[in-house]
Amino acid sequence: MRILVLGLDSPLGYALRSFATPLMRHEIVGVDMDTTRWRRERQVKKLIRRDSIDLILDARLVTQIDGVDPVGQPDIERTRWLAELAAKDGVSYLYLSSARVFSGTLTRPYRESDQPDATDPLGKTLIEVEELLKATLHEVFILRLGLMFGGRRPNPLARALDALARGDRIKVSEEVRGSPVHVAEVARVMHGIIDQMGAGAPRSGL
């Protein structure tokens, strides 16, 4: 499969590419995070139709969550452009979302079948993006991730370590809980999913 990775210069993007190169089962093409800050739909159309692709792997928003740039309305509009063009061209879509779609107020562990219930601005934006993709695309696979970390920056763990090295004071919340995952493990799982898609498995799911 020929895969367009949005956010190829992110820690996750580097991990995806490092897994793909030795396996040589799929061709990875992609754009850096700065390039994905499109201002017009025609910029997205030019990217998608420049070369024939089978799958869009969208790592934009899950990367921004762990960075310093806010996720907001412009990202929803860009996702709309991507989804409509992918639907028109018959391109499958693999979207990396976040567990932040859940509020964390349940007293039991969340299940993927639970209805997203986040009320904070970030969580509500992520929910809106997921709903937009499901409403627009027939072949969309959504994978929700927890906090990611790795050796490459930017990521929350690296920022915390850098701050400690400078002697800065770090503020954290007692109420935020999760299961951090290394970007290499995410990349391994992603390649497994893509392999199954390439072998004929359904290209939609949550």
What are these language model-derived features?
Residues L6, V31, A59, Y93-A99, ...:
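SDR active-site strand-loop-helix element
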Residues I170-K171, E175, M197-L206:
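A recurrent short beta-strand within the Rossmann-like NAD(P)-dependent oxidoreductase core
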Residues H26-W38:
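A short beta-strand-loop structural module common to alpha/beta enzyme folds
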Residues T35-R80, L85-A87:
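NAD(P)H-binding glycine-rich loop region in Rossmannoid oxidoreductase-like domains
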Residues L6, G72, I76, R108-E130, ...:
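Short-chain dehydrogenase/reductase
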Residues M1-M24:
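N-terminal Rossmann NAD(P)H-binding glycine-rich loop of SDR-like oxidoreductase domains
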Residues R80-T119:
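Conserved Rossmann-fold NAD(P)-dependent oxidoreductase catalytic core, especially the SDR/UDP-sugar
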Residues E131-G178, E185, H191-G192:
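NAD(P)-dependent short-chain dehydrogenase/reductase
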